[in-house]
Amino acid sequence: MPSLKTKGAAGKFASLLLVLALSACSRPAPPPETSGELRVGTRNSPATFYIGHDGETAGFEHDLILAFSRAQNWTLSWTEKSRPQALFDMLERREIHLAAAALPQAVVKDRHLISGPILFETPVHVVYRTADRAPRGVAGLAGKKLAFIIGSGHGPMLMRLKRKHPELSWAAVENVWPEELLAQLQAGKYDAVIINGMDFDAMRNFYPGLAVAFDLPYKQKIVWALSPGSSHAFRNALARFVERARSDGTIKRALERYFGHVKRLGSSDILGILQRRPQRLPDLREHFQEAQTLSGIDWRLLAAIGYQESQWNRLATSPTGVRGVMMLTGETADRMGVSDRLNARESILGGARYLALLKDALPARIAEPDRTWLALAAYNQGQGHLEDARRIAQARGGDPNSWADVKEALPYLSRGSYAKVMKYGYARGGEALRFAENIRNYYDILLRLEPEYDPLINLGRGEDGLPPPG
């Protein structure tokens, strides 16, 4: 998941200010049905709304709100607040039409606001440091420093649990984001924290020392909160949109985009890339950046592929004969003009050319980011086997242009259940799935830790990123 603190060019920053400009006017917002403008309050969160590495707004709820506003032909304005209470106040003053901030339905109803349709349900985790002994059940939290965020909806459940476990105690903290709460847990301020799965899943790759001990015996229903003055026409339009988004796969694809890959890596995998990054990546960074210039593919994605393939080992060789940083086969190396697969620069440029070729070979109607994830599967098992998986996805009633549907079809390549639609025969489809999903995770980590590369901005700079003296 991209960092919440993304540096961009001046133009991107200006756009961000426009998108997140706080309303200076406290007058009630006119209904979107008459004004043609949908005003939404949100919070900056990797699960909800953030600025991506390309300077564009993104996030699970962001994508759904954007689709809703487009379906109604309304313009869209965002107001960002750091606390749910501030969003609730704006709703009560009718300054915004709805709030989208991973809000539990129970919290919305407790505030006597209008709950939109349920978007999805998320488990509630008890998260601890893996260096400590994992608490076993609620009884194991006795005597522990436990914390949760005020307004998260966890208080009522804890009060009910305390009736059976009177020794249970906790700190209810405010003015922090879930990411900050996890950082405090990792730093030792608390022994365990309560956080919903939506928030933890979005950040688990950045806290390899934390893990889920167990889930509390309830799930949270995530909804959008509507202003008390919302018209029936607005509520009905929202209900129809959510119903359609659930049936046509829009919600499924959004969940896949932001959360579908985040549980693939184990703690050792995350620690591995964090430890090897300062040791091995510096010698390869300029080659990955050159490959970006030639292919147009983000160098951090190419570096993620290189890590998945060889852990950035330029001399890597497998028993099957694939070699080098990008672990190219002899045939692929010949096609891409690579004469020495153990030459790091040649291997990286060859891998970038190959991925660009695979992306270009896909039908033009396939949009990003699905286009890239599908190309990664083809990078691992070949274009022909990817096309078989797309045919299987379609035969199963899915969308062959959606990674969310094709990823479910990939394992069938090794089962033969759909042999009649498989032109290219058996393949290790599950391996292609793991390959693509691992790379997505490594890419998320590198997006957070490594700056973007702009060849024009970096023109004339040295290896340290600084301009020449004088």
Curated annotation (Swiss-Prot):
Entry's Gene Ontology cellular component terms: cell outer membrane
UniProt KW keywords: Cell outer membrane, Cell wall biogenesis/degradation, Lyase, Membrane, Signal
Coiled coil region boundaries: none
Signal sequence bounds: 1-24
Localisation: Cell outer membrane
Keyword presence, Nucleotide-binding: no
GO biological process: cell wall macromolecule catabolic process; cell wall organization
InterPro entries found in the cross-reference section: Lysozyme-like_dom_sf, MltF, Solute-binding_3/MltF_N, Transglycosylase_SLT_dom_1
Residue numbers annotated as active site: 309
EC number of the protein: 4.2.2.n1
NCBIfam families linked: PRK10859.1
Domains (record comment): The N-terminal domain does not have lytic activity and probably modulates enzymatic activity. The C-terminal domain is the catalytic active domain.
Family, per entry: In the N-terminal section; belongs to the bacterial solute-binding protein 3 family. In the C-terminal section; belongs to the transglycosylase Slt family.
HAMAP family per record: MltF (MF_02016)
Protein name: Membrane-bound lytic murein transglycosylase F
Record lineage: Bacteria, Pseudomonadati, Pseudomonadota, Betaproteobacteria, Nitrosomonadales
Gene, per the UniProt record: mltF
